[in-house]
Amino acid sequence: MESGSIDLDKEIDELSRVLLEHPAHVEKVLKTVEFDKSALRYIDAILDHHLKQIYRNLTSNSPLHTLSLLQKMASWNNGLACVRVFQAIDWNSKIFIKMLQLPNQIQNSRKGNKRLKITISKKRSSLLLLFITFLRLGTPEIRLEILNSRKLTTPLFKGIYNDEPSVLKELLQCWLTYVLLDHDVSRATKLSYFNEWSLSCLASLYSRDDEIDGISLCNLVHKFFVDACTVPGEGLCFVSNGWHLQKKVDGQSKTIFNRVLQSFVFSLHVHTSTLQRELVLKILKACPDITASFIERNSLTSEPVLSYQWISFVSLLQAILGMGIPFPFYDAETRTVPPTNIIIENILPSSFSKPVVLKALNGNDKFVCFLTVNTLLASFKRLESVLDEIKRSELSEDNKVELVSKISDAILLRLPDSQTFVQLYSSTESDLLKEGLSRILLYFFTYFPENILKLKIDTSIFLRLDLSPGMLDRPFSRLHVENIIQILRYLPEVKWFDVVRSPFVFLCLMYLQTSHSKLRDAIISTLNDVFSQTIIFCPSLAVPPILTILASLQHTSPTQHKAVLEFLNSCINRCISRVFAYLDVCVDCFKKHSVNSQKKTAPEVSPISVTLIEQIPFFLQKRDISDDSKDAVLSWLSDLFSNLVCTGEDANCLFHLLENVNVTAFDSDYTLKPFNQLMSFIESLAVQKLPDYVNQIGSLSQYLLYSTNDELSNSGIQKFGMNLDFLPLYVVIITKRIAIMLQSGDMRVKKFLELIRELVEFSKEETMATSQSPIRTLLSACINLRPFLLQEQYISFNMDFAEFLIDTNASIKGSVVNTCVLDFLYKSFSDKVQENYNLIRIAAKFMLLWTQEEFIGFSKALDSFLSENDDLIYKNLDYVAPLLFECMQFTSTTNANMFSNNSISVLLKAAILKPTKLTHGMFDALNTMKPIISDFTVFEPALHTVENFDLTDCADEQILLLSSFVNFVPLFRKVIWNLLLNNKEALIQKYELLAILCCDLAKQYVAEQSQYDLERIRSFCSEVVENNLDLVLQKSHLIELLFPLMKLSDPKIQYYVKVSNALSEKYLPQGVLELLVLLQKRIDIPSSLRVQTIMRIFAILTRVLSDSPQIGLSLEKFLTNFEALIKMNVDILRDEIDKSTLNSFLESAIVHVTSFSNLRLCLTLAFTMTAEQCDSSRFLQMILAHEKNPLAGEDSSDEIKATMSAIICKLTIIGKNYTLSVLDQILKLFKGRYTLHDSLLCELLAYFETLDDISVASRYKGWVITDEYDMMLLARKDGSGVLEPKIAANTVNQYPSEWEKIDLKVFDDLETTEGLLSSYCSNEWNREVYHPLYALGITASLLHSNQQVSNIQVIVQQNFLGMIVMGLSLFKEEARFACLNFLRNFIPILDEQKFREKHLIKLVLASIIVNVPSSENRLSTLMANFYAFSLTVMMKPTHPLFVGINRYYLQRQHVDVTDIPMYYELLYPSTDYTKSVYWLLTLLHAGLQTNQDLKIYLRRHVFEMICTLYNSCVVNSEIRTLIEKILLKVVALGGGPMLVKYNAIYPMLQMVIPSFQETKENTVVSTT
């Protein structure tokens, strides 16, 4: 040491001389004296002896080398000396302020003095790099001091525009990482440092065009602002409350508000810089609370003319309005929405005022007008979103109406009058502008109908559209048309069927000319609404009339579409004007039809159908119409009437009307062939037939209706193409086709049902997505097929139709199908019609479509029928069983019992009487019904039936049901025993099923054996086992059924031989081993046979484990059972086990070290074998070196790790493998944590040190700090381990004071070892702390490896010395003696060091030595924790408690170690109340580890204090959380009743601990 100190003095003298004479060469000198090895000593020497010279150098003309020296000293070894460097120098000195102000002199310097500019810039850059180092590596206190220094902040930001790009990049990244995104830096500090002026200075960097590594500086600045200002809850951005008023912070009167960002966005150049514009939009999106004020202040100052300023203003406004509605719009906590004025300002800002809008709309520039319209559309879209949010909110309906009214009125006042937009729409020719204006008008109709409907708008202005083929392909034109269609629905008194300009014809032609689905949907929806307001069509039609009309036009030539639609339009116009006259015609037609058909119900026919037929002769008489047009109209009428008949109109009535047409009135030159074809089609449909001949099929609807069965195919459908809009019509046509086939006696309808399924799948099942889809409604309504439901002659159709409905899930509640089935069942059960029972099977199929309500409703009627008609049920069981089965299935799935006891009795007998579907259903439902069957007499009818059973004729289902009865009803057991005893031959035929029955009976035997003939049963079981043992051993799933029988039988030794011989490499069922164990317990097996069996199993497992890459679940269970077998035969195995067999097995088993059952088996073998029976050393080396050893990773469970540690300990002990190689390998696996597996290894390592003077510490060679955060490497001679200061800190706060040494004698006995291993999950263990022995040993190793200043500082700062101090609170005196001895030896080593805090550390250690004179005195956990924490505080003079703790030790040498230190000083501090109280509570929480610690807390009335504190208004949520943790720890230590009894804090405990009722009950008992 002396020579070292002499060398150091020489080096320091040399360094001093260089510093005085050549400050520029300091770095070179430091390299020559090996700066890295003794850095702290040199740094101390420089700062202590040459501080004045450093100041002189800094004030000189060339301070760059000195600044570089300070930076290197501060950054050495990840900032280990950063605090020293920072505290040694006054950074608020004018020297540094002047350096930061120098760049401002560049503007005043002479233009030609380039060298001066470079020098000035270098000085500031070097200083900034030094500050960056302090921010990165310094403590939070250093950062806070730098950030709060206004003298440095102002010149820093003032000259930042002229800084070097590389320095700016480092500075921005440092600010972002270590200030803005660091949660340890308070929000107030961030906002004070980065205020609006600072941010504006930084924003000036947007104008610089420098590049750094190919990235422009402005992009780096932009990224900095985006990360710092646009993430809610991070950086400078508070979490916004949307448009709501800001909430108050807990305990404060102020509200959180983004005021800095609000001021900052006004200073950004949004109209000239793209990046700044993007930044503003992102800030507004993250902080919607400042959007309204920004829009209000960012108003337009010039006229709305085509200028850059106008375009920029409007585009920015559109971008802001295009943002989504901020969350939450409706605040569930306050049950409010934002203030109305804020909502309105965010929808239509006042800066975009009505005069400005009117000037823009009425101006001459169409582009300005277009931009204005787009901005208004953005406002309307936001209005739409706001109103939708209001509808979804939980406000009352009255409040919703009132709020919507306020918003609508306010927005309407800010908008121009709707007349302005109507006039502009009618006068403009631009497609883009027309589309936008049409959308605005649509919004007016939607949200302000009263305003726009006051205008008398001519419908014709919306119908002046070009319907040329290319027009609808243009997106804007198509959107325009969609808007017009929506507007037409809102216009009042639209003449839809006007003869001159008919909107109906216009929309139909548009539908036929476009292929865009959205436009088509809009047209169909609009025309549906139109037709729904008239009575020209029958209301009962299955398909909307417009679909029928449009589908009928499919095969008409496009050139004739207009002629057909004009004919239809004129007929509709006539029908509407004379609808009642046509109704009279319909009534007359009804009367004649009823006479002819003798039907009671009136047939369906539409007035428009009457009109069309009436107008046929007048239309054909017109000579100005071409024959082609007439043919087209008649052909269309043929399709239309055919489709109407399929959807519900009566064909007979239509044919009757057609017969009355005056054919002689036709044009003499016109042929009657088209009309005759029309008559032929309708006549065929009227008599339920298909036409004999079809001239030409031109559409898919015609193809589906008129093509023959052979012609109908998927290829034909694809040929015509399918319009998804007409899918309901196609389905109805196919059902009509099926009805015609069924009427003619043709039952081959399955093809047509599959065709419906394919049509639905072809449409990608879009129509089946919802329960109200038209396809589901059509199918469940059973259009055209209802007359054939549940009819005797249509049974096959009903089966096919039911399966189809089930597969397509096409039924809905209350559908025609369900209603029809329910009516049929009600009638069948009430009338008791024998013929209907055959159809009940069909009805049961349809029951799968029922809802829960329909099932429950039907069950009441069924329950009554079952109770009164049991004989009828038994007689027709084959018919009614499917229906009863569905009821049982419903019962088992819904857990709802629908039947009375009488009905259940009937069902039970019916289920066991005959094997039917009911037997299956009863087996599933019986367990569900068990809790609700209170009277077991319901089983008596079934019991009488079972008494007469012949088991040889029983079906499998009946036997399974019997086994269920056995477990359910005691009455059945004796009956079934007698059945089995009298039917032994049945076991030979049906052993697998009857074995289940025997097994269930045998399980109940012990409790009820007095009721049976014991000898006869025992003989029976023995016979069953003997006759079926070979069969059972071949089928692993039957083995478990043998156990109950084996227990009741008289086993033989030959059974043991058979069972053991059944094992092989491919057959290892766990039940075989259980049988071996059972047999060994029942009879005396010769030891030679047992050894032979176990050796054979060893050989089989050796091969299996060698060939298996991993152990499966079945093999895991087998190994567990094998372990039990070995434990039963330990005595004979120790003498008889073969060494080679055992070695081979262990070698193959060690491969699977991650299997728990395998490890438990190896552990059992380790206790079974002797040192001579296996090579324990080799197997120990294999386990330690295994790459998948559970102790080496974190994936395995603690249970597996504890077992592995026990195996290592046992193999080491029995083989006496106490070698250095084994020691080093154990050290690799040893983590030193306070867990069961590490504790076992720790005791083993301690035992190593007692043998042959082996030192664990000698295996370490030193330590270094890594680049990882809070991590250090303690290197061993053959590897390295990791020390974590974080875990050391946890150890101090959660120290295991009750640690007890584990005696290695536990490994003398397997049972004791297993008892120890079962505690692996005990609350005692904690993987987040170090083991006390490890903490002592590792700290001693650190100190032994290096006693330099840096090492001593690490030991103290990183809580390693604190762990030794905590060792004084251990209950074990030997451990306390070692810790106290370490501390006594540490003080002399500390005296030899030279660092500033040395005397402070000695002050704490001296207090420990004085107040803990010997190891006999145990220090309380609380006091030990206070001492440990004091050591870390003494190393940080900037710590807020440094002054108080220092004063505490200076004022007293002797302290009361049984008291709470600094209790009142911390509870009632003069300054910084929150931090003091928080630290006191932290100390109280850490000091509460054992029951003995509770005495100190009770004596000082701690719990009364913390309860008072908890309810105080001056504490924050963190303090309350800490108080809750203290109370929870008291309850965990068993002090809950004491708190309730003596401290009366039950209400608070009940609030903190939800499940505190048990504690209260214990308190009452103890008090009593």
Swiss-Prot record:
<dbReference type="Pfam" id="PF11707">
    <property type="entry name" value="Npa1"/>
</dbReference>
<protein>
    <recommendedName>
        <fullName>Uncharacterized protein C14G10.02</fullName>
    </recommendedName>
</protein>
<dbReference type="Pfam" id="PF16201">
    <property type="entry name" value="NopRA1"/>
</dbReference>
<dbReference type="InterPro" id="IPR021714">
    <property type="entry name" value="Npa1_N"/>
</dbReference>
<dbReference type="GO" id="GO:0000466">
    <property type="term" value="P:maturation of 5.8S rRNA from tricistronic rRNA transcript (SSU-rRNA, 5.8S rRNA, LSU-rRNA)"/>
</dbReference>
<dbReference type="InterPro" id="IPR039844">
    <property type="entry name" value="URB1"/>
</dbReference>
<dbReference type="GO" id="GO:0005829">
    <property type="term" value="C:cytosol"/>
</dbReference>
<dbReference type="InterPro" id="IPR032436">
    <property type="entry name" value="NopRA1_C"/>
</dbReference>
<dbReference type="GO" id="GO:0000463">
    <property type="term" value="P:maturation of LSU-rRNA from tricistronic rRNA transcript (SSU-rRNA, 5.8S rRNA, LSU-rRNA)"/>
</dbReference>
<dbReference type="GO" id="GO:0005634">
    <property type="term" value="C:nucleus"/>
</dbReference>
<dbReference type="GO" id="GO:0005730">
    <property type="term" value="C:nucleolus"/>
</dbReference>
